[in-house]
């Protein structure tokens, strides 16, 4: 059975996305695949190329023939050079820089705005005003405490 490593297209119109598939050479482009070993998204910047290197090496080793576009992708990832024993097995794949997490962005914005994140609410809670009945009782207790303190000082002076 002639086996090819080829691109199986899926995705929207004008936004092609491909699976890198190992399939019988007689099957149609998007037909049944023996195994999917990677993916290729050419419209993203830089293009997303993910190939399972171990499986690609296996299929190349058992005689699967890559199509021309897949051969170029294998050269970019370095799998073709590794298979042939050529120098440059590290490949020339460009990788997108990871995006900072939303939590990191939030903490950076807080640090810039106020000096650091806080665990409290952003607006202070309103304190309840003491009830009017409690206010005179507290006022009455305060002079009583002062009188008691004065009485305790008086016997000590005698």
Curated annotation (Swiss-Prot):
Which terms does the UniProt entry file under GO BP?
translation
- InterPro entries, sorted: Ribosomal_bS16, Ribosomal_bS16_CS, Ribosomal_bS16_dom_sf
Q: Which GO terms describe its molecular function?
A: structural constituent of ribosome
Which residues lie within the region annotated Disordered? 112-158
The UniProt entry's GO CC annotations, sorted and at most eight, read: cytoplasm; small ribosomal subunit
Keyword set for this entry? Ribonucleoprotein, Ribosomal protein
Here the segments flagged for biased composition (Low complexity) are: 137-158
Q: Which Pfam families did the record assign?
A: Ribosomal_S16
Similarity remark: Belongs to the bacterial ribosomal protein bS16 family.
- What NCBIfam families is this protein classified in? PRK14520.1 (NF011093), S16 (TIGR00002)
Could you identify this protein by its name? Answer: Small ribosomal subunit protein bS16
Q: Which organism is it from?
A: Mycolicibacterium vanbaalenii (strain DSM 7251 / JCM 13017 / BCRC 16820 / KCTC 9966 / NRRL B-24157 / PYR-1)
Taxonomic lineage from the root:
Bacteria, Bacillati, Actinomycetota, Actinomycetes, Mycobacteriales
| Gene assigned in the entry | rpsP
């Amino acid at each position: 059975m002639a086996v090819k490593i080829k691109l199986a297209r899926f995705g929207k119109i004008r936004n092609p996305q491909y699976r890198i598939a190992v399939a019988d050479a007689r099957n149609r482009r998007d037909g049944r695949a023996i195994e999917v070993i990677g993916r290729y998204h050419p419209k993203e910047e830089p293009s997303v190329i993910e190939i399972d290197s171990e499986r690609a090496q296996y299929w190349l080793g058992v005689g699967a023939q890559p199509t021309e576009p897949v051969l170029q992708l294998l050269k970019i990832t370095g799998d073709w050079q590794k298979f042939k024993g050529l120098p440059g097995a590290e490949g020339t794949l460009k990788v997108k820089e990871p995006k900072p997490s939303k939590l990191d962005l939030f903490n950076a914005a807080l640090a810039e705005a106020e000096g650091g994140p806080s665990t409290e609410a952003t607006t202070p809670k309103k304190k309840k005003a003491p009830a009017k009945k409690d206010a005179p009782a507290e006022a009455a207790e305060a002079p009583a405490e002062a009188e008691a303190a004065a009485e305790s000082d008086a016997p000590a002076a005698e």
